[in-house]
Amino acid sequence: MITQIKTPRQKQRFLNACRGKLCLGATMPLAFALFGKSQPGRFFAGPTLALDVGGSTAWLAGHANPEELAGFLAFCGCEAVVLDEAECPPPTGWKRAKTHSVFGLAPGRQLPLPEADASLWQSLAKNTEPAAGKAADLLFPDRPSKRDDFYSELCSKRSRGLARVWTLEREGNIICTVGAYALANGQAYMACGETVEALRGKGVGGRLIVEMANALAAEGWMPVFLCSPERVHFYTRLGLEKMGEYVRYAAP
């Protein structure tokens, strides 16, 4: 039975289902710790299930009955769900849409810095404490509600030491950014790598990603990325290791 988390036992079920899961073992417990009280209708648990329905895409760790899951996700208005096919069968009637690959770097390991345009790289200043608002503006210029949510969540996490953002800047303008948006349970979930369109393809984004991953791994974190099929070659080229897969299913 999928139920809203209201008791210590239900909370423990949620955390147990997340434990040891790549990416989700960091993102879901951290989201619950920060927003479980203010967004009680977002987090649900079953005997072996953790479920976050905070947006149009649900995130699932563990296992659920396929028919019950399909009905529950439809009731919540979810358009998609991301799950581990090796552990959880898809919701009944839902269609396989996309495979997401997990790439990562073992704690303590270091990658060589990839090539980048030397003159461009030298012209940029690295900022390890950029303004959250400026990063949000770069990432979501045409989605004001998403930008505001991102800004609020980043501020909440960063003030607690649970997220980091790095940027490359020129004259105060962000040229490139990447962040670790969930530092929890030994994992550093990295995401939102973005370079301004005019300067893409020059290697600065990849080098910034590797620099941050190396720094986190040196501290004992395991940097992890969840990427779409079109980004697999990029992360492979950087030297990151493919560690697993999740699958996105779309509602009928």
Please provide the spans of the model-predicted regions:
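N-terminal charged segments
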Residues: 1-93
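Conserved acetyl-CoA-binding loop-helix of GNAT-fold acetyltransferases
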Residues: 65-72, 191, 195-197, 201-218, ...
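Conserved catalytic-core motifs of GNAT/GCN5-like acyltransferases
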Residues: 96-108, 241-252
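Conserved GNAT acetyl-CoA-binding A-motif
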Residues: 76-86, 216-228
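A conserved beta-strand-loop-helix scaffold within acyl/acetyltransferase catalytic domains
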Residues: 146-194
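Conserved active-site alpha-helix within GNAT-family acetyltransferase domains
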Residues: 87-97, 206, 229-246
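A conserved beta-turn-beta hairpin within the catalytic core of GNAT-like acetyltransferases
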Residues: 54-59, 182-190, 200
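Short amphipathic alpha-helix that is part of the acyltransferase structural core
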Residues: 1-27, 99-103, 107-149
